[in-house]
Amino acid sequence: MNSFPWLTIIVVFPILTGSLIFLLPHRGNKVMKWYTLCICILELLLTTYTFCYHFQLDDPLTQLTENYKWIHFFDFYWRLGIDGLSIGPILLTGFITTLATLAAWPVTRDAQLFHFLMLAMYSGQIGSFSSRDLLLFFLMWEFELIPVYLLLSMWGGKKRLYSATKFILYTAGGSIFLLIGVLGIGLYGSNEPTLNFETLANQSYPVALEVIFYVGFLIAFAVKLPIIPLHTWLPDTHGEAHYSTCMLLAGILLKMGAYGLVRINMELLPHAHCLFSPGLIIVGAIQIIYAASTSPGQLNLKKRIAYSSISHMGFIIIGIGSLSDTGLNGAILQIISHGFIGAALFFLAGTSYDRIRLLYLDEMGGMAIPLPKLFTMLSILSMSSLALPGLSGFVAELLVFFGIITSQKYLLMPKILIAFLMAIGMILTPIYSLSMLRQMFYGYKLFNVPNYYFFDSGPRELFVSISLLLPIIGIGIYPDFVLSLSVEKVEAIISHFFFFDSFQEKRINGKRILLV
């Protein structure tokens, strides 16, 4: 166990210092904004320092572990730890939250509560990614939903309460299945609850029971990822939420579902994952094509970007189902890559709305001349969304593509068919991306009238846009920087499935053998 509680400090620091924001002057909006921004920067620096000096990349085991007895009544521990799978999402969370705080600068109504909720969400997300106890993971998962619901219901468009209610109904429904899975796994085969991830990774279950647990977790994570048909909350939520909240949703919240699939479904329930992985690949391929073909029909700019996010999540699903180290590395890289791309697109959509007060594409046009900086940034980021070579999306999707082609788990013809469907989705992506640019920036609309003048992107908006663009370019040029974080852990996860294939005939009373 680690001698110094680095992770506890990282988890608690945002919400603890954020609660002090209510002691600041009520009318001091600038003071609150700078205070929140400083907290996010300090948290990001602390996280970076901890990982740089206390984390070993070549070790696939859990590091910086902390284990404190919390509730003695049912043996509940405060267990934290990180490995190659969680370090990337944690750093992504810090980076996106810091920029989202800067993006929320124009928010003035109930600014104290708004910034506190962002910091509370920050703590919940880092807690979910660093939890090594199943019940603690569930508590952090649920805790994070409270600030998200309040951010959605109090700031945004006219239908924000409807979208927030839809979001909480979907996620609360998924949380019921998550709780059932947590209690089922924790209470199975023992008089006392077993909730430690390391212990549960060595636990064996009857096949039917493992499948039931897997389905429960899959439904919970499918809502958050989202996986069709449990995706309908996402376009409505993005369409009404404030764009800084959209940055957090697209950049971090969706990735929690993918993280849960790998952390729990793949690691703790490998036999059931072998059974369900072909279905995941089929659903992922369908999702890529469905969302990419639905996106061009969306006139609301933010809903169109939301459907593009759903399409890109299909690549993550296929990578997780590929059961290959190349495919899983591609899925993890897509988690990081789309975190930057999705956050950047929603930020630019929000800044354009701040200027023209329009969200529907059929009302726009001719914005390239009055808003050249916005036009340039959105054009570059749209290219990254359609996986232009040299940008992060290209490397991630290429790895997933090769991962499914080179997977040893599937026959040749199904792999060719899935690759063909993925290629169709890649072809459809430029259709909605380029048509969005054409409708916004080209043509002859109201913005070409001489009497109309709009302020282009200012220093704050350019800083946020460039800060999101640089990692996209950096990962596209040198993807090993991100892949090196998770490659050892991915090999350890995938090796379990090959080990299982070698000894799967050795079963006793319907239970699988020990996989690790």
Curated annotation (Swiss-Prot):
Its EC number is 7.1.1.-. Keywords: Chloroplast, Membrane, NAD, NADP, Plastid, Plastoquinone, Quinone, Thylakoid, Translocase, Transmembrane, Transmembrane helix. It catalyses: a plastoquinone + NADH + (n+1) H(+)(in) = a plastoquinol + NAD(+) + n H(+)(out); a plastoquinone + NADPH + (n+1) H(+)(in) = a plastoquinol + NADP(+) + n H(+)(out). Its main location: plastid. It comes from the Eukaryota. GO terms for molecular function: NADH dehydrogenase (ubiquinone) activity; ubiquinone binding. GO terms for biological process: ATP synthesis coupled electron transport; electron transport coupled proton transport. It is found in: Plastid, Chloroplast thylakoid membrane. The chain crosses the membrane at residues 4-24, 37-57, 87-107, 111-131, 134-154, 167-187, 208-228, 242-262, 272-292, 305-325, 330-350, 386-406, 416-436, 462-482. InterPro entries: NADH_Q_OxRdtase_chain4, NADH_Q_OxRdtase_chainM/4, NADH_UbQ_OxRdtase, ND/Mrp_TM. GO terms for cellular component: chloroplast thylakoid membrane. It is a multi-pass membrane protein. It is an enzyme of class 7 (translocase). NCBIfam families: NDH_I_M. Belongs to the complex I subunit 4 family. This is NAD(P)H-quinone oxidoreductase chain 4, chloroplastic. It comes from Oenothera argillicola.
